[in-house]
Amino acid sequence: METVTETGTGAETQIGNPMREVKLAKVIVHINVGKSGEMLEKARRVLNEITGQKPCTKQAKRTLKEFGIREGEPIACLSTLRGERANQFLKRGLEAVSNSLKRSSFDENGNFAFGIKEHIEIPGTKYVPELGIFGMDVMGTLERRGYRIKRRRIRPSRIGKAHRVTQEDAVKFMTGTFGVQVKEA
């Protein structure tokens, strides 16, 4: 939203609708280890150090005999970041991938995702030999004001088509706010 000041009067007029502003709703950082036990605990410690908050564990949805995974066994951990913490982590995470994303990383609903092969690529992260190196997925969700109506408890409703965040809106937000270069896949 632009703010224009008229010369001499000191009055400010706003251009643009504040309801149309796109904002970062949340960032999810996810590490999938594929097995429970010591490796999962190490991944939790790494995620705790990187995000600054305690991660939760996720269980396997079904049994996969080829990989030795049983249904209900904890195999992954994730942290959901919101607000300023999400903005700060996303800036650091994008530096790990050279501030560039593919257009295919954005979906039609204003979400984006990218992978980081080694957590030590994130600026400010040090290698700890006892923990090892983990890769992670970073997923972001973009929203506009008014998206609460689909999550509220009483009389939830749908977001209208004109108000939804599209792929183009998401690309424009990421290039403008975070300086991301979007490559055509």
What kind of region is each of these model predictions?
Residues 1-185:
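Ribosome-associated RNA-binding proteins
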